[in-house]
């Protein structure tokens, strides 16, 4: 049985997590701008691939941006049950919003469009996956 205190020993680096969050939030990705959403999908795909994920790009339909499916190899092999994480990385803010409302970091807090919904949660999910892989 795993040690209950092992989670406390994981090397979470707040600065690294916040740096990824700031990069992702700086990539404006309004829902109805397929090119902008695809740039965000490129960024997320790169980060996930660097963790060892197999990336499948699913073309958007009806003028919308693409989706990304990232699959990580299971230590028990193919067919073993896994973990499903779903998220969106588009925002409601139009291109140019960051000129008027820039993202910013103040200590351990970040502010701006996309920081919480939903890029922040997705960055944390990616970090959790990184920790699972490293464990």
Residue spans for each PLM region:
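Acidic/His- and Gly-rich active-site-bordering loop/insert found
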Residues: 2-115, 133-134
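Acidic/histidine-rich catalytic neighborhood of metal-dependent amide-processing enzymes
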Residues: 118-135
């Amino acid at each position: 049985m795993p040690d209950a205190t092992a989670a406390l020993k994981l090397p979470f680096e707040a600065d690294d997590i916040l740096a990824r969050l700031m990069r992702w939030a700086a990539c404006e990705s309004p829902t109805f701008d397929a090119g902008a959403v695809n740039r965000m999908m490129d960024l997320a795909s790169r980060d996930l691939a660097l963790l060892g994920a197999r990336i499948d790009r699913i073309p958007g339909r009806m003028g919308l941006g693409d989706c990304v499916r990232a699959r990580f190899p299971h230590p028990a092999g193919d067919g073993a049950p896994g973990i499903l994480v779903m998220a969106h990385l588009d925002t409601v803010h139009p291109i140019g919003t960051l000129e008027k409302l820039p993202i910013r970091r103040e200590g351990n807090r970040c502010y701006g469009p996309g920081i919480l919904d939903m890029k922040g949660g997705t960055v944390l999910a990616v970090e959790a996956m990184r920790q699972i892989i490293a464990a």
